[in-house]
């Protein structure tokens, strides 16, 4: 199980990313539209003035049961071993173990 402080930090980052999403996206679009270097610089300053943790690259996908940051399946938002346990216990409808 991941430390609770790391899970809370990621939740805080997710809130910040959602709050500044439109601002960051619009300033990035304006950077690509504008051809003058001085105007581009203004939009870069606006982009850099937003908090560092509001960037989507700072987010880490975590298992919502254990908080484990690695080996996560996007479709289920679960880590590999929890996914396997839940499939074996028939807790995920439609998911079956492969056999060949």
From Swiss-Prot:
GO terms for molecular function: rRNA binding; structural constituent of ribosome. It is found in: Plastid. Coiled coil: none annotated. Its main location: plastid. GO terms for cellular component: plastid; small ribosomal subunit. Keywords: Plastid, Ribonucleoprotein, Ribosomal protein, RNA-binding, rRNA-binding. It holds the Pfam family Ribosomal_S14. One of its GO terms (biological process) is translation. InterPro entries: Ribosomal_uS14, Ribosomal_uS14_bac/plastid, Ribosomal_uS14_CS. PANTHER family: 30S RIBOSOMAL PROTEIN S14 (PTHR19836), SMALL RIBOSOMAL SUBUNIT PROTEIN US14M (PTHR19836:SF19). Belongs to the universal ribosomal protein uS14 family. Binds 16S rRNA, required for the assembly of 30S particles. NCBIfam families: PRK08881.1 (NF006477). Part of the 30S ribosomal subunit. This is Small ribosomal subunit protein uS14c. It comes from Cuscuta obtusiflora. The lineage of its organism: Eukaryota, Viridiplantae, Streptophyta, Embryophyta, Tracheophyta. The gene is rps14.
